[in-house]
Amino acid sequence: NLNTFYVTKNSAPREVFKAKLKIDKMSGLNNLFKGSGSFYDCEQNSFDVLIVDEAHRLNKKSGLFSSLGENQIKEIINASMFSIFFIDENQRVTLKDNGSIEEIKKYARYYNASIYKMNLKSQFRCDGSDGYLAWLDNILEISETANFDLDSKYEFKVFDDPNELRKVIEEKNKINNKSRLVAGYCWDWISEGKNKSDV
């Protein structure tokens, strides 16, 4: 009977969980989810537990014009008796992404909250393949690991032409509809001006 919410900055993860959980016909499903900008005006300890996914994506301020509140991490910690942050600082994708382990620790100390740090051993979206993640960190020089060889389940290629990359991915997708082309988004690319040749 805890007052608990799943919190993310982006609505996409919330919508995926809502769609999956609706299969079980849970009532009041929308009441389990909140956006990260929902806590700027909350009283202290309004919630029992806030589970914050992708905490590295949190912004400093809330609202459409980033004009509400002081700091989303501070506001989440203030609003709940127990806050859980899932964070991977290597997955920040925009200049506004403010979530960091140090920021979380700073505001936890501000509220005299106990801090418990745990490491997840594997990622569901990679079928639990820690070897793949370690290999990727090593090849991209994110961190040095002992994984120099790629598991045979994966194929790794470097392309000089993005159109050729797209073509190969489209061909792979015809096999089992599980191939995607994705890219991080950091800032607007304007078709006029200095970035014109890149768009």
What are the roles of these predicted feature ranges?
Residues 9, 88, 186:
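Cofactor-binding loop segments of dinucleotide-utilizing enzymes, especially the Rossmann-like FAD-
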Residues 3-50:
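Inter-Walker segment of RecA-like/P-loop motor cores
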